[in-house]
Structure formats: structure tokens, C-alpha cells
Amino acid sequence: MAIFVYLRFCLVETADRQDFEGDLRAMAELAEAQPGYLWSDMGASMVEPSVYIVVSEWYGIEHVRTWEHEAIHEEIQHKWEAHYLEPFVHRRFTSWERPPDT
């Protein structure tokens, strides 16, 4: 079953956003090579410029967990933890399909 992952990052004012965006792009490229990766999209909020959102879809939860514990991915996560204004938001969702008409 497909798993959707939602990530929300809110950076402090002094964070280097260009560096952060570069790391997001690097992680997106690395994710594309991971087993079970289907797609992702990311960007800055149109409402709050210090907020970034990442949404991705994976074939299964095992693939998400493997990706989350990939060494380079963990290294980048830890690099930015001190630069969050708010707690990092991480949610997982399963897809919903309309039941057939009965």
C-alpha cells in the first residue's frame, strides 16, 4: 500500500535558506534512487517564507523507514535540527480510494 509522507520545517530567521534548499534538493535526488520511491515535491510556503514543505509517496512503509535511516539522510536531518523555530512535523498517510458503487 502506498505511503504518503508530509514534512514541515520552520526555520529560524538566521538560518541559511539557500543552504537548506540545497540540502533539500540533494535529498530529493538521493531519494529518487531509493527502492520504493515514487515521487516527491517540495517548496517554501506562500504564506510563511520560513516554512518549507516536502511531500513524497513511497511504495510501502518499509521503504520509508529505510530511507529515513539512510546515513546521509540522517546526517542532513541532524545538521538542521538546531535551526528549527518550531518542532519539525513528520506525518505519514495511506492512500484512500473511493469504494465501488454498490
Stretch-by-stretch model annotation:
Residues 1-51, 59-69, 85-102:
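Short S/T/G/P-rich N-terminal loop/turn motif that feeds into the first structured element of a domain
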